[in-house]
Amino acid sequence: MKKLLLWLTALLAAVGLGILAPGPASAATSYCGLQWGSLAKAQGPLSTAPVTSVRTGQHYCFDRMVVDLNGPVKGYTVRYVPEVIQDGSGFTIPVQGRARLQVTVNAPSYDQNGNVTYNPAAKAELSNVAGYQTFRQVVYAGSFEGYTSIGLGVRARLPFRVLTLDGPGSGSRLIVDVAHFW
């Protein structure tokens, strides 16, 4: 019993003298250090550079969708919506997931002569996202009057970012990354 009291006294003295002190409180950090939000993101005017493809990929902290264009990306709108709406008709497009992003590229899916540059065979599944942590479905919502829309079904309303990158060649890419967690 005396040894226990001696150890407790020594421990209390060490804490009191600052020899044993708790580490500094760390600032709250977001998942993977991502500082994204879930509010709408929009930029720029219309482009005549047509959409040529849509693809997806998985990363450690997020899932990624890439829209390829045959020229520079000039504008886009990406936002969470209650329903994905088809361009021109106003019809609702069914999209799997508990939340939906409507990705509108300010560019057509046809060239200046009206020739189709992007016409996916499976409009309800532009990319197979089975096994992705965040993505649930990627659907084509159409191209109308110079705008091309894609519906992105996700697991929940999660933070996202939008990037534009030049290349390859004279083309460019619109990138939508959606985090796995907050």
Question: Which stretches of residues belong to each language-model region?
Answer:
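Generic structural signal for short, solvent-exposed loop/turn connectors between secondary structure elements
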Residues: 1, 15, 90-92
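Bacterial N-terminal signal peptides that target proteins for export
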Residues: 1-9
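C-terminal region of N-terminal signal peptides and the immediate post-cleavage residues
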Residues: 6-7, 16-32
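Short linear recognition/processing motifs and adjacent strand/loop elements at protein termini
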Residues: 27-182
